[in-house]
Amino acid sequence: MKISRRRFILSSAVVGGGLAIGYAATRPSGHRIANDTLAEGSARYLTSFLRIDPDNRVTVYVNHSEMGQGSHTALAMMAADELDAAWEQVRIEQAPATDLYAAGDMAIGFAGEFGVPSFLMPLIEASAMKIAQIGNLQTTGGSASIRFTGQLGMRVAGAAAREMLIQCAAERWGVPADECTTALSYVHHNASGQSLSYGELADAAAGLEPPEAPTLKQHTQF
């Protein structure tokens, strides 16, 4: 696929004391749309596809329909795998019916597979997202949920959140981030024996700028 992960902007937000992180294809107004349509009280959303609550629960918001094909479970697992989340603490919710979750990434993904010249991709991206937003489209079909939302969205969101949580833990402990590891929704510093749950770090992590192109796991790491 010829679409770079760098075309996907990740955002984070404080949601009731937790961390919400999502992705959008070059949509700088995504955070404004979210706050105008979804925010309640002090909660703030920024294209939220992944949420971590203080009690260490992880919620994955999916903008595709589940019709028995297993896409909801698969997409949540792709995010959870990159996040190193404890699966028993992961829940799945259908994304709200707002243009924030419009599935314009499907058209963008197909354009990449069809070999559209790179100089046309910015126009394709802008047009696809605008059409999807106008129709509030949360489309399901063409095996696109896993290929595009999963590979370009859920994996990137999970990897970005993991890096943010590690950064927060490392700063709190005063240790290098590369000395920290993650497993089952916890960040560990083995040298000192310290551990923090994702829920404990979520509020601080929400204040960080998400990495634009986080490092994804190799197949051998799954």
What are the roles of these predicted feature ranges?
Residues 1-222:
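Cofactor-binding beta-sheet edge motifs in enzyme active sites
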